[in-house]
Amino acid sequence: MLSSPIEIIPVTGRILLREFLAVPDFIYADDPAWRPQLKFERAAHLNPQKNPGAAAIEDRQLFLAKRGAEFVGRIAAFINPEHDTHHNETVGFFGFFDCEANKETGATLLSAAQAWLETRKVEKIIGPAQWSTNEECGLLIEGFTTPPAVMMPHGRADYQGMVEGQGFVKAVDMLAYHSDLHAGFPRSKLAQAMKKSAERNKDIAIRPMGNDFMAEVRVVMDIFNDAWSENWGFIPFSDRQIEHMAKEIKPIMFKEGLWVGEYKGEPVAYIWMIPDLNEAIRDLKGRLFPFGWVKLLWRIKIAGVKHGRVPLMGLRREFHNTRLGLAIVTKVSETVFECARDKGFTHCELSWILENNDGMKSICEQAAAVPYKTYRMYEKRLSS
């Protein structure tokens, strides 16, 4: 009952960790847009032995909110030394924030995270994030009626008031674009001109993923670490994180989903589209056993998933804000979308894109994609 007091419990041991993992399914049980995540995958996400992103965290504490006999909320507070080193600041993060529709519960959870971080002498708090901006991050601000795409967060509209009520202010917004892969033709005159320009230029080559998957992943992530290096909140992917990401994505990807753009024989751009796993697991209730894995394999490998997501897309910095760079990216992206249509995909999400990244926003809009979800990163400076 809402009249019962809230108790904040630090997570220790496996039993409480299972409760921490179970909170989202309880909170969003009546939300038609919620897609229960695979429990084994979420458990691995928290495990430093299985997730290099979690292993990079120097210090962390998970909290549960309990009202009566029920766990009604959760939050994490943590320190990411890679962020501090890269940005030359002392920052604490909050993340994994989900709670019941009660302002007191949200305030109590956020206060617990802040109190823990204050003992670590951080200058400010950023969030929400799940270990870093390279993983799920941002508070959903717009777009509550549609399901989250794979590796994107979900939430409720009242979270914004809870977070801002605790003194957090907007740091930056991130956008998710939605593309109907069979709409928006003919493309704009600019898009058509850029595509033709790339096709006429003998120094530009567009190629699909090669046979050495791990080598290709290293190529595109090298581009990513360069392309995104000046963006808000950027932390470079480490070698371990790149290998882990490749291992996680390989079982669900399709070969035609990764294309690389080369200039004078050197890789300078790429776009990577994957099936939206959340579509395939929509009714599995987070479990693959005893028969969920059969449904999952059928939907991904045989029946086909109709929705995709582009989580990674990049162009080397030296080509930013140039017609040459725009031509290369336009050709690469249109090639991926064409291959996706041939594979039976009907829609695609491109996410996330920083609100001030006009170049990437322009590329999305050239492909007739429209912004349909907004995620917000918050910050709060602490008094010294």
Model-derived regions, located:
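Catalytic cores of nucleotide-enabled group-transfer and carboxylate-activating enzymes in metabolic
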Residues: R14-L17, P36-F40, A44-P48, A56-P81, ...
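Acyltransferase donor/substrate-recognition loop-hinge adjacent to the catalytic core
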Residues: M1-P5, P153-G233
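An acidic- and aromatic-residue-enriched active-site/binding cleft used to recognize and process polar
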Residues: G68, F78-E82, F97-C99, Q130-S132, ...
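Acyl-group handling in specialized metabolite and lipid biosynthesis
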Residues: P10, F144-V150, R207-M209
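A conserved beta-strand-loop-helix scaffold within acyl/acetyltransferase catalytic domains
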Residues: P24-R67, I75-T85, N211, A215-L315
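TRNA-binding/sensing appendages of the translation machinery
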Residues: L2-A44, Q114
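Acyl-donor binding region in acyl/amide transferases
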Residues: T85-G167, V172, L284-Q366
